[in-house]
Amino acid sequence: MKLLWTSQHIKVTVHIDGKVSKMDVLEAIKTRRSIRKYQDREVPEELIDKILDAAMCGPSAVDERPWHFIVVRNREMLEKIPEVHPYGAMVKDAPVAIIVCCDSSLEKIPGFWVQDCSIASQNILLAAHSLGLGAVWTGVYPLEDRVEGIRRLFSIPEHVIPFSVIPLGYPAENPGTRDLFDPDRIHLEKW
């Protein structure tokens, strides 16, 4: 069995034949935080490939897999994102951003692409965290001004909807973890 990668941040070892020797997914979920400050350090292409592989491993309605991803490393383009996204200031300091998009021509069940792209976005965040990177989800859809701004900036065709922009890089901050479990939000059997 040939080793593909190992994470030092969560207990994950993946081998080329697809077998996982150990994994602590709950730790990744509970310790992932939104990271908005990044070190001035490039993210290797192989890590981006692993992150995108994880994004595409998410479930999707009737397996339509409507997602497309734009990987942005060009500094000039990264610095333009906050001009069309009011909450995208952190993108200017990130070495890379991934724009998650939906190709509406791939839709089999109208509207379910939002769930599919949400899952892909969450997988990007978790995969980045597991690889020692920090990331933050900045929403684009459903706000039309953001959708049109990102579409225009990246020459995205009309049938493709930009869903989220996820800047990522090596963290330059550690916001710590916190317990978000709230039993008051749980209802048994009925509301």
From Swiss-Prot:
GO terms for molecular function: oxidoreductase activity. The keyword Flavoprotein applies. It is an enzyme of class 1 (oxidoreductase). Keywords: Flavoprotein, FMN, NAD, NADP, Oxidoreductase. InterPro entries: Nitroreductase, Nitroreductase-like, Nitroreductase/BluB. This is Putative NADH dehydrogenase/NAD(P)H nitroreductase. NAD(+) binds at A127, A128, H129, S130, L131, G132. It comes from Methanothermobacter thermautotrophicus (strain ATCC 29096 / DSM 1053 / JCM 10044 / NBRC 100330 / Delta H). Belongs to the nitroreductase family. Its EC number is 1.-.-.-. Its cofactor is FMN. It holds the Pfam family Nitroreductase.
